[in-house]
Amino acid sequence: MKLRTISPALALVVAAACTSESPPAPVKCEAFVLPAGTDLLAPPTTFRAAVVPLFVQSCGFSSCHGNALARNAAGLYLGGKDEVPDATRIRKGLLEASTELTSMPLVVPGEPTKGYLMRKLDGDHCLLDASCEGKSCGQAMPRDNELLPAEVRLVVRRWIAQGAKDD
């Protein structure tokens, strides 16, 4: 009887195909629902004192939205960790259209549900995939991480609901 050897590469392919691990479950795309009784008009939420520091801490990495001199992800600057953030510039960028869904502004003052920013932060941007460039609205933000805690997102939501002022 003649024995044949299999190449190590083929052995790895066969072993990988025979493992019992199942592929990761697909991410569910569900609409964010604001908890009943949530007051978006109180307490007052200011952009410079509450929202900008949150963006700098959560989004202001140089590889994401934190480098004022370089092209940032989605072309959006949200303040850098190693600089004094330009709040006026940050707000101006938030009032522009999304690069993934150009028909939708990032922020609609007074209406948090109508802007793309809260969709990305809440993780329900995937409901808009058919309208986005390339038929995908990309990842939730922050990218490759869990969603920000609901109470952190509520700060941004309140600021938008209260008019998205530069205060």
What are these regions (language model features)?
Residues M1-T46, R157-D167:
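Post-cleavage N-terminal segment of exported redox proteins
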